[in-house]
UniProtKB/Swiss-Prot annotation:
Function of the molecule: Catalyzes the decarboxylation of four acetate groups of uroporphyrinogen-III to yield coproporphyrinogen-III.
Annotated family: Belongs to the uroporphyrinogen decarboxylase family.
GO CC annotation terms, alphabetical: cytosol
Name of this protein: Uroporphyrinogen decarboxylase
NCBIfam families attached to this UniProt entry: hemE (TIGR01464)
Subcellular location: Cytoplasm
Gene Ontology terms: biological process: protoporphyrinogen IX biosynthetic process from glutamate
Gene that encodes it: hemE
Alphabetical list of Gene3D superfamilies matching this protein: 3.20.20.210
């Protein structure tokens, strides 16, 4: 296999020496870019954008044409799996994703089956293959999925941004039904991510967007348990290439030790966590990704650079840090501020990697 021209991200995920801190942005292909909006208009709607490999490739590549990012991430949606299960995904204008047939009845839940990614999600695999070819080994491609619990939230509630009344009622009244959904979802996520890896993804990420809405005990039982199941089933190698995995629970700072023990290679942090404290807690086990408040990108360039330096200094010297936002980039972000961020990370981080550059890595892999 041809070597990557820039494998800094993969080395950082495995806590191997790097010359600088790599950076990519959650939702880096998105509405803050005018070219994305133009492509979306040509596609007709968001789902058509996701389901057409040509469009998905085009928008995946757009931020890399603007910014010297260290990774591409597959352009898709976290709800492709429940859509493939037949729940009828659609997007209401101004309201986000919705399902025509949310899971409310026991017979519907018992009838759930694991979709075959090669059949029901072929368009995603075609996009992964096409993006890899288009990247031409420039930077690695990250594949992703929603976590079993986050998918279940949408599947039961029928929409996002709710008070979680439906799924929490099920959790406490009929935990057996929720466990059934989560087990099916975990099998589906495992198959989906493995298919992405086989199609060319060089790292994978699990987005646990709603895990932070749970109590401590419920998080362990209904979210982390099933992400651990997924991680245990993932391909760790594709040929001779190691495939790192990232887990991100928004609001999961209280559970870093548990997440670090799940089998992932890196833990994503939201902006409420001090990354230096996080490193002291789990940095001997996993790499850390994050964790700038996305709202910082509304500030002046000097403020952005200062906030970047604060996070870099908090993490400290050595490898094992992937710079990112603490959540997805806002659609209102000025693109030039994203460039300021990326350039600041690259320039300011080098002094924290001098020992790495000299071949000395105290943290190992």
């Amino acid at each position: 296999m041809t070597r990557l021209k820039n494998d800094t991200l993969l080395r950082a995920l495995l806590r191997q020496p790097t010359e600088y801190t790599p950076v990519w942005l959650m939702r880096q292909a998105g509405r803050y870019l005018s070219e994305y909006n133009q492509t979306r208009a040509r596609a007709g709607n968001f789902l058509a954008l996701c389901k057409n490999p040509d469009f998905a490739t085009e928008v995946t590549m757009q931020p890399l044409a603007r910014f010297p990012l260290d990774a591409a991430i597959l352009f898709s949606d976290i709800l492709t799996i429940p859509d493939a299960m037949g729940l009828g995904l659609y997007f209401a204008e101004g309201e986000g994703p919705r399902f025509e047939r949310p899971l409310r009845e026991e017979w519907e839940i018992r009838a759930l089956t694991v979709p075959d990614p090669a059949v029901h999600l072929r368009y995603v695999m075609d996009a992964v293959s096409q993006i890899r070819k288009t990247l031409d080994n420039r930077v690695p491609l990250i594949g992703f999925s929603g976590s079993p619990f986050t998918l279940a939230c949408y599947m039961v509630e029928g929409a996002g941004g709710t008070d979680f009344r439906q799924i929490k009622t099920m959790l406490y009244r009929r935990p057996d039904l929720l466990h059934h959904i989560l087990d099916i979802n975990a099998q589906a996520v495992t198959a989906y991510l493995n298919a992405q890896i086989e199609s060319g993804a060089q790292a994978v990420m699990i987005f646990d967007t709603w895990g932070g809405a749970l109590s401590h005990a419920a998080y362990q039982q209904f979210s982390l348990r099933y992400m651990t199941q997924v991680l245990a089933g993932l391909r760790r190698y594709q040929g001779a290439e190691r495939i790192p995995s990232i887990v991100f629970t928004k609001g999961g700072g209280l559970w870093l030790e548990s997440i670090a023990d799940s089998g992932c290679d890196a833990v994503g942090l939201d902006w409420t966590v001090n990354i230096g404290d996080a490193r002291r807690r789990v940095g001997h086990k996993v790499a850390l990704q994050g964790n700038l408040d996305p709202a910082v990108l509304f500030a002046e360039p000097g403020v952005i650079a200062a906030e970047v330096e604060q996070i870099l200094a908090s993490f400290g010297e050595g490898s094992g840090h992937i710079f990112n936002l603490g959540h997805g980039i806002s659609q209102f972000t000025p693109p030039e501020n994203a460039l300021t961020l990326v350039e600041a990370v690259h320039s300011l981080s080098r002094r924290f990697h001098r020992a790495d550059a000299e071949g000395n890595n105290s943290f190992g892999s």
